[in-house]
Amino acid sequence: MPPRASAVPPTVRGLSLVSLFNDFASEMVYPLLPAFVTRTLGGGPLALGVLDGASELTSSVLKWISGRLADRPGWRRPLILGGYASAVLVRPLIAMANAAWQVVGFRVIDRVGKGIRTPPRDALIAEVTPTELRGRAFGFHRGADHFGAVLGSLAAWWLLRRGSDVRSVIGWSVVPGLVAFAVLAVVLRGVTSHESRVTGRERGGTKDSRLASRDSATFWPPVLALTAITFFRLPETLLILRIQDRGVAIPAVPLIWAGLHVVRSASSYPGGWLSDHWGPRRVVAAGGLLFASVAFALGLAIGPAAAIALFLLLGLVAGLTESGERALVARLAPVRTGRGFGIYHALTGGAALPAGLIFGALYQSASGTAALWTSAGGMAAAVLLWLVVSPSHERQGGHNNLP
């Protein structure tokens, strides 16, 4: 049986509560964006692809930079605080948009905060958690994050049911965002900023350059394979658009989105437990193959009930993969953990822009079925690549696998 969540360190629990409220705010907005862009503002599937892709690319570039800064003494706390603050301030401004390009702009600025905060936060979680519990710690954090998404989606649905329009719902997202920032200030009070464990030699001095070159060969192949898996994972805005195309009414979308995150939240901690016991290699492969199967099925001529069921099944993909991927990165980069997470998040997030453009254009110019089946086939190939290059077991100890 999986151990209780009491095994998770207090700092991880606190950061999980912050993520819960932040995603509460974020997911009051995100599931409404496809309808807001395409029906209120007159955009199309390509605009949605650009929306997802541009925002994730911006976030990814900042994750690379933030990850490098996170390994410097005293930087983690301000990076985490600044990242959450910017999201709280900018996210409600989406309600003021009068054109699709404005939504893209506000969403990009919103994701700046995510880019700043994510690597130092994940590095802090890895730092305070014993190696053998990291899968569960990240699973606990992701579970709380997804539970916040459940609450946000339900809040959006409730407000729509009471007659609020989409703009009003987006504006109300400022409330849980402010709560998240207040909780964060309490959590980080007394948390000592990461003091560098990286000596001059470990920072990449010439004396150990051959060691760094050798170890980087261990880090890069699995991370690049994860990037390929991310690329072929169809953007969620297009998945929402697909179920709308299959007859799902717009007012029901926030409720269905909440159901997706119920599945994600419930499966995240067990997924972390599986990663700790079976290893990320098997768990990530299972998640990728599940996505490929569901994407293929969504491409068929199905009714709204079947589309909803398949969409909810996608929640297991995140539950199986997210915590295992993060635990693997922490083990591959035990010294430069911030840099490792920066590279991982930057590459996997950076894959979203070309993916959004390609799949959005394919959806718009050909069909939803073409986009989904291309995604499914590519995902199957990416999983095969992952099985070839990913480590069958994770190395322990203090070796650093980054140049």
Regions found by a protein language model. Name each.
Residues 5-56, 220-256:
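Helix-loop boundary and gating motifs at the non-cytosolic
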Residues 35-40, 151-170, 354-370:
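Transmembrane alpha-helix termini and helix-breaking/packing motifs in multi-pass membrane transporters
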Residues 50-68, 258-270:
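Central cavity-lining transmembrane alpha-helices of secondary-active solute carriers
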Residues 62-74, 160, 267-279, 363-364:
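Helix-to-loop junctions at the C-terminal end of transmembrane segments
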Residues 116-129, 320-333:
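Intracellular juxtamembrane helix-capping segments at the cytosolic ends
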Residues 168-186, 372-387:
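Symmetry-related core transmembrane helices of the 12-TM Major Facilitator Superfamily/SLC fold
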